[in-house]
């Protein structure tokens, strides 16, 4: 019997006492107070739980975070500290935060930084990347419902500039890895073909029917995952138009809040059966 995976109550309880800007003046906040550090490191432990989990377990973790409404206080505090809410978002190149640092926060290296404030900035930046990577739907919902237009615009531009390409590259690497692990079918058993274009941020999925390929393309926008991927028809063979359009609409809806895997179970076309895609 399968039991839903969960994050420990003790760890989740540490996410309840979220800091706010009202609690600290600028001078104290720059010192990276212990309470703030503990709260942010608790989030880091939460995302560590995602890193080695299966897609099904990640889905359970995401539901816990969303149902508990934990993400809003984190992101509100994050974008206050990093300047997005004041239309003065942190410039990562000036802060000396490169792509490797965005992807990974190193506590030992952080201790050697010239200021506690830069340590805090690095951890916040890494947490935002991990949020986009592991709970993109929850982050996106926060962004869509953000009441401050200035913050919303700033966050989208900042995400596009520094984070989206990294998240997309991670996703496309996952798709390539998944595709490479699929068994090749026999001559009588057709299999789904996957082609990835990293430069154009596209995934092509196709199935051969009568020596022709029926295929779709999934295009990832410049501010992904805040903006959704687009599913478009490339070539339709042997499938009625109405059924094909239903499939495209289904797939578009299924990936609206998805980032980890575009295709995980082998999917197929046939003249009398719909093209079945499972997205996690």
Predicted regions and their residues:
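Long alpha-helical solenoid repeat scaffolds
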Residues: 1, 39, 43-46
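Extended amphipathic alpha-helical coiled-coil/heptad-repeat regions
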Residues: 1-11
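Ser/Pro/Thr-rich intrinsically disordered low-complexity regulatory tracts in nuclear proteins
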Residues: 10, 17-21
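Glycine-centered motif in EGF-like
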Residues: 23-34, 39, 50-207, 224-279
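Glycine-centered tight beta-turn/hairpin loop motif at sheet-sheet or coil-to-beta transitions
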Residues: 209-213
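Short beta-strand micro-motifs enriched in acidic
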Residues: 219-223
């Amino acid at each position: 019997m399968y039991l839903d995976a969960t994050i420990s109550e003790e760890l989740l309880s540490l996410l309840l006492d979220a800091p706010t800007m009202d609690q600290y003046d600028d001078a104290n906040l720059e010192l990276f107070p212990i309470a703030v550090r503990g709260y942010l490191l608790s989030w880091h432990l939460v995302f560590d739980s995602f890193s080695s989990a299966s897609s099904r377990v990640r889905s359970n973790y995401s539901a816990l975070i969303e149902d508990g409404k934990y993400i809003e206080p984190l992101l509100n505090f994050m974008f206050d500290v990093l300047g997005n809410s004041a239309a003065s978002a942190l410039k990562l190149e000036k802060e000396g935060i490169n792509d490797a640092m965005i992807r990974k926060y190193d506590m030992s290296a952080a201790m050697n930084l010239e200021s506690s404030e830069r340590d805090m900035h690095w951890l916040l930046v890494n947490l935002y990347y991990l949020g986009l990577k592991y709970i993109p739907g929850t982050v996106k919902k926060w962004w869509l419902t953000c009441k401050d237009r200035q913050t919303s615009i700033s966050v989208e531009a900042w995400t596009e500039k520094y984070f989206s390409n990294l998240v997309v590259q991670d996703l496309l690497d996952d798709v390539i890895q998944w595709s490479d692990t699929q068994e090749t079918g026999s001559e009588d058993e057709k299999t789904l073909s996957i082609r990835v274009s990293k430069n154009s941020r596209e995934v092509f999925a196709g199935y051969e029917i009568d020596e022709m390929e029926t295929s779709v393309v999934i295009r990832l926008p410049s501010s992904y995952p805040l903006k959704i991927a687009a599913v478009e028809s490339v070539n339709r063979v042997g499938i009625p138009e109405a059924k094909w359009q239903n499939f495209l609409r289904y797939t578009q809806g299924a990936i609206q809040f998805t980032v980890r895997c575009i295709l995980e179970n082998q999917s197929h076309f046939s003249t009398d059966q719909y093209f079945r895609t499972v997205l996690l």
